[in-house]
Structures are given as structure tokens and as C-alpha cells.
């Protein structure tokens, strides 16, 4: 819990600095790269989380892995080095991207489908999104075969369930009453 709060504080500070230096977009790209790299590379995540590895080694490794990042991003690495908080780097990157999207009026729509989305389903989802939100929306697709067909759409605290599994549950309740 406290590491999440710390990640939010770091993310707010970084977005403030990046905005003041007109580098918020570039830093957002860096943070997306950092978050996806840490999430997809278990060795890097283990390395960052390992308390027995010296913070100097962590900073040097991150500066080497993310050599092409913005100076604001590199200054975050140094700040985490000074405060010995490298273990929250992934959380900071995720929180930064959430704040960046919020500031720029972008919402993430989480769409769960039984199979990967095709153009037809994506058009239906975008039409439904238009009824939920007037903001610019990016779609994040998750595949879950247990919903059988259709889709489940989540935007913020709203959910629209157009899955076959949900329709079957509704039908089952109606028949049992």
C-alpha cells in the first residue's frame, strides 16, 4: 500500500517536471516502455526487486537498458538510486501513464472477448464506447474463452456485459423464477 502511494507521489512529481520541460509525451513513451519491459521480463523485475543487489548496480543497469530515454526519465533513475526505491519503478511507470492519460482526457477501455477482436467487433465496441464516454478512448483487449462470445466492456467504474455467458446466466435466472 505504501509503495503504491510512493509510486503515485513519484509519478506526480515526474509528470510535473516533464510538463515544465515540454517532455511529457516523450516521458510517457519512456514510462510505457519501462512498464512493459519490466512486466514482460521476469529477470529484469527480479533484478530490480532483489535487495541484495547494490543500488549503484541497479542504476547503471537501468541506464544501460534504457539508454535512449529522456533526461527526465534518467533523472528518475538517479532519484530512485538516492532514495533506494528501485523496487517501485514499474509501479511509478504505470501510475505516470494513468496520470498522463487523465491529464490528456484519454480513457482506457478494457474489453474482454472470447477470441481476439476483429474489425467488426471493434466497430461494435467503439459504438458502445461512444455511449459511455465523450473522451478519447484507447482499447485494451483481453481474451477470455469462458465468456463464450460477445464482449465485456469496462471504462472507469462502468461495465457493459454483452457476453454470451452473461446472457445464459440471465436466461437461467429468468427460467428458475
Swiss-Prot record:
One of its GO terms (cellular component) is plasma membrane. The keyword Membrane applies. Pfam families: OSCP. It is found in: Cell inner membrane. It is a peripheral membrane protein. It comes from the Bacteria. PROSITE patterns: ATPASE_DELTA. InterPro entries: ATP_synth_OSCP/delta_N_sf, ATPase_OSCP/d_CS, ATPase_OSCP/dsu. Coiled coil: none annotated. Its main location: membrane. One of its GO terms (molecular function) is proton-transporting ATP synthase activity, rotational mechanism. Keywords: ATP synthesis, Cell inner membrane, Cell membrane, CF(1), Hydrogen ion transport, Ion transport, Membrane, Transport. SUPFAM superfamilies: N-terminal domain of the delta subunit of the F1F0-ATP synthase. F(1)F(0) ATP synthase produces ATP from ADP in the presence of a proton or sodium gradient. F-type ATPases consist of two structural domains, F(1) containing the extramembraneous catalytic core and F(0) containing the membrane proton channel, linked together by a central stalk and a peripheral stalk. During catalysis, ATP synthesis in the catalytic domain of F(1) is coupled via a rotary mechanism of the central stalk subunits to proton translocation. This protein is part of the stalk that links CF(0) to CF(1). It either transmits conformational changes from CF(0) to CF(1) or is implicated in proton conduction. Belongs to the ATPase delta chain family. NCBIfam families: ATP_synt_delta (TIGR01145). F-type ATPases have 2 components, F(1) - the catalytic core - and F(0) - the membrane proton channel. F(1) has five subunits: alpha(3), beta(3), gamma(1), delta(1), epsilon(1). F(0) has three main subunits: a(1), b(2) and c(10-14). The alpha and beta chains form an alternating ring which encloses part of the gamma chain. F(1) is attached to F(0) by a central stalk formed by the gamma and epsilon chains, while a peripheral stalk is formed by the delta and b chains. This is ATP synthase subunit delta. The gene is atpH.
